[in-house]
Amino acid sequence: MRRSVLVALLLGGLLNAQQGNDKLKKEMDERREQLFKQFEFYAHKQIYRNNSTDDPKSESVIKRDLKKERETISFFFEGMPYFLSAFDTDQIKNSNVDAIQEGTIDGLIGSFNGEGIKVSVFDGGRVYAKHTDFGSSARITNKEAATIPYSGHATGVTGMMGSKGHSLSVTSTKRDGVTPIIVEMNTKGMMPEAVFDSYYYGNSILAGETVEKDSSAKIRDSKPALSNHSYGNVIGWSLENGSMGVGFYWRGSYDPSNGRSYDLNGTYYGRDKELDDIVYNNPYMVVVKSAGNSYGKGPTSNTMFPGYYYRDSDGTWVQFSSTDVLPPDNCAAGYDCIPMGAVAKNIITVGATEKIRTASDGFDGRYTQVSDVKKASYSSAGPRDDGAIKPDIAGVGSNILYPSTSSAGSTTYNIGNGTSFSAPQVTGILGLWGQIYKSLFAGKNLNAASAKNLLIHTAQEAGNVGPDVWYGWGFVDAKKGAELLVQKNQNKVIFEDKDLKNAEKNEILVKTDGAQPLKATIVWTDPSYKFNYNTYSAAHNNRTSKLVNDLDLRITNVQTNEVHYPWKLDPNAPRNPATKGDNTVDNVEQVLIDQPAAGVYKIEVSNKGTLVNNDGANAEKQTYSIIVTGYTEIPSPEVIPAEASPTLLADGNNKVNVKFVENINSIKVFDMSGRLIRSIAPSSVQTYDVDFSGFPAGIYVLTASSANHKLSKKIRKQ
């Protein structure tokens, strides 16, 4: 009977997931159809406008340009089109990946190089599978038709993760930026034994299929366990060789009558919602996204390009006049230039740093202190407009030697910079952690929330204390993450998924000797935010929280009742150091006590309001990932009546009734190791049924209290 119930639950879960995906497919297909209708209208206007000019382009040229634009169209906003664009082995040592590749981590048997791991790469074209750096073309599967050209960018991004390695001596400079130095560079990737599926980020018909899909539909239908996305929307100032020639093009709104300008950097919009929908319906899909390379772009700080252009109300590019008030450069105040599409809640957004230098000016240094990490000048900065922390993490993105190719296919090499390269570094590390996780935990996979939690909890401090808008939660450290997985396997840390039910609190008691920081981090896959803004003035810097299920993490000193709160940013002054308080915008919460007093601490997770699902209906629970480190033991509960005989739950009866003559204040359930696994705070009731259906068979201790009474009882569940 129990087996039948388990099968029914599993089938029910799969059915619910499929229903969610079917609904999402219908919504996304309708959006894509509407998008192409908008583009068709836009194309007709462009053709008419071109034919009406004194010096029109040829019909073949205008159609070629429109065909490319149709492939990369992302969305329209107030009638204006926005397009996708690509964002352009020292990094192995910088992030301590070599410890995993070489098998030098205590507690792990053997080395890990991506064996058995597959990554889907969504990029600017097909990956050249025959490049010598991949060793074998069998490692690359191009999902696109042969009509999509090979891409040097896609090949380089894939090589960052999976290249076998190629050494090259190049001329660089010392820290002074002047003195020349010869350095040895290598293309070796994070996972030289992994395999890759290659997709074009634009609109296309996949090989063997008949229906055109955009990148979101390709992600939704292929359901990759791990995917890399080194591209994004072009927002704000963009240096382009556009229709008006080489210059800065303002990808936003501008009103010449009053000089008012708006952009959509930091705005949660269509692509963000779609990605959150996809991951919510498929919680084991880990999506990694580059933050963008727009920091500092604009005419104010780049005077060598004299042409500055904006779209008028008809969508025509016109030049700013000498009396126009130019929009500020991207991130002119040091923040707010991550584009929409990279601020989704359930993905991992990656910023870029310079390589860590050694004392002898090499590029293969290791992290030893905060000042080792330098922000890459181009790396886009957060936060999301409601103040949520973006990027989530930072990795090396500068001075990268990578395998490249021509559009026809060739083995070449290049050196480049960009969050395009920091993102696959993080993706590769997640792949290695996934391989380690499988080896330690019977082939199981990390889900999206747990993968993100592992990144954030083990990140090295960078920039301001706590999270910030340049580095997110810090600099990625592959070794620390692998070590934490070993500690989980040895039951030395808490790293698990838990369910929070409405109107309940989950509590864990831990004891520390005060010799190390006590840190807890929770991450959850949140329902998508259903935005309703469709004008620039409403969308620009919209401070409304995009969080749907607002979970709260607190750590309380049991002896003193002092409560410790999570990090948060000020949305109106996000470059200021993070403070601690009630975080109402992030689906990540972390509480850090740098110097805890020795004693017992209560780690509590609760929620505000009512939990809902992705359709907005009331949800029974919200699953979250929690990591706790820095404790020395998990204490037993205060009362365990060892002499009492357990109350046996009858077969099929999974509820225990608690009844007092006055209102019940608290109900708690412990396992026999003393770990608190359920905490309930009933609201103004004298009787309450405690549901044990979600617990495995075993003996539990139930405690309950009111103002003047206490109850403690052992429960045996078969």
Q: What are the residue ranges of the model-derived segments?
A:
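C-terminal outer-membrane/trafficking sorting elements
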Residues: I640-Q718
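Secreted peptidase-domain scaffold signal
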Residues: W473-N549, N618-E633
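C-terminal subdomain of the subtilisin-like protease fold in secreted/lumenal serine endopeptidases
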Residues: A194, Q435-G514, N613-N614
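Hydrolase catalytic cores
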Residues: I393-V465
